[in-house]
């Protein structure tokens, strides 16, 4: 279980898979998709899982054009995120065009592709973990990131300021985690259901954590981000359900071995002369009139 560049995005998983070695956690595809904030949102949206409206931009695009498109399609305030970084690195809130230009410029120092999405001003953030595979999975208890006096706003809750603004960047973890989350039974059940749907839609395996946003004005719930290798495997969320850390590790290993056995029994080659027959057909068809 590792964290960082090239080990959460499917790179390491692909390397291990080449040697037919079992490994815990998500496979190559789900790891890569989970790391790409835009791709994961598009897939979830296509499967009727609620996500915030967003746009993706590349480094070669003019900042003025980016600002114009955002103002026409998303509206302020917005969140600017590097597309494939974790731990809230490079995430900035923008409430006007000047802040957006600075935020975009800042985000492009971390990645060549960025995500810009609508910000919820009156939000509650809730996290939920999922454990299992494509056949069966369970959702954990839910936790809430409770805002303190230092992080009352959405901007402070994420990361405030960019490299040009001189603002102090604060971690999302500056808040206090409240376990269980202060949400209704209906909200909890919906979050757990959406968590499991997200898990299966992205083809995950093992333990992941999904971050949700609740709009307290509308009570709408959105999937925010997927963490395919959560810190400490989000054990504290499972402890609330009676799952011990050793049980969590055993289950991770069990699922890894199960997947490896299934892959070993798959057929990855198919002997056929279909291409040869196609080529012969082309040769035999020379000179034919249509």
Residue ranges and their predicted role:
Residues 48, 176, 182-290:
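ATP-dependent carboxylate activation and anion-phosphoryl transfer catalytic cores
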Residues 1-35, 50-56:
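A short, GP-enriched loop/loop-strand-helix hinge that lies immediately N-terminal to
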Residues 95-171, 182-187, 221:
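Phosphate-binding site of ATP-dependent enzymes
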Residues 31-123, 134:
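Active-site nucleotide/adenylate-binding loops and adjacent lid/helix of ATP-dependent enzymes
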Residues 3-4, 88, 145-148, 227-239:
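Glycine-rich phosphate/pyrophosphate-binding beta-alpha loops
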Residues 12, 36, 187, 191:
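Hydrophobic (often cysteine-bearing) scaffold residues that line and stabilize catalytic clefts
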Residues 23, 54, 80, 116, ...:
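Generic preference for hydrophobic
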């Amino acid at each position: 279980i590792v964290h960082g560049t090239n080990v959460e995005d499917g790179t390491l998983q692909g390397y291990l898979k080449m040697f037919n070695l079992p490994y815990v956690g998500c496979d190559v595809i789900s790891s890569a998709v989970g790391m790409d904030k835009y791709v994961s949102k598009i897939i979830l949206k296509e499967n009727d899982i609620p996500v915030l409206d967003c746009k993706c931009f590349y480094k070669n695009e003019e900042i003025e054009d980016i600002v114009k498109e955002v103002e026409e399609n998303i509206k302020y305030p917005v969140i600017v995120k590097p597309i494939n970084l974790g731990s809230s690195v490079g995430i900035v809130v923008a409430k006007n065009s000047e802040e957006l230009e600075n935020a975009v410029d800042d985000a492009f120092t971390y990645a060549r592709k960025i995500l810009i999405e609508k910000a919820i001003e009156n939000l509650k953030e809730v996290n939920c973990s999922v454990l299992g595979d494509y056949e069966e999975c369970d959702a954990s208890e839910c936790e809430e990131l409770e805002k303190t006096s230092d992080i009352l706003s959405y901007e402070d809750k994420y990361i405030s300021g960019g490299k040009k603004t001189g603002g102090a960047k604060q971690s999302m973890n500056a808040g206090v985690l409240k376990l269980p989350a202060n949400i209704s039974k209906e909200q909890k059940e919906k979050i757990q259901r959406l968590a499991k749907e997200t898990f299966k839609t992205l083809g995950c395996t093992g333990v992941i954590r999904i971050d949700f946003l609740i709009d307290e004005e509308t009570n709408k719930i959105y999937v925010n981000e997927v963490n395919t290798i959560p810190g400490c495997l989000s054990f504290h969320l499972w402890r609330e359900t009676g799952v011990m850390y050793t049980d969590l590790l055993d289950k991770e290993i069990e699922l890894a071995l199960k997947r490896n056995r299934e892959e070993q029994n798959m057929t990855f080659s198919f002997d056929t002369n279909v291409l040869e027959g196609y080529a012969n057909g082309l040769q035999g068809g020379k000179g034919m009139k249509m």
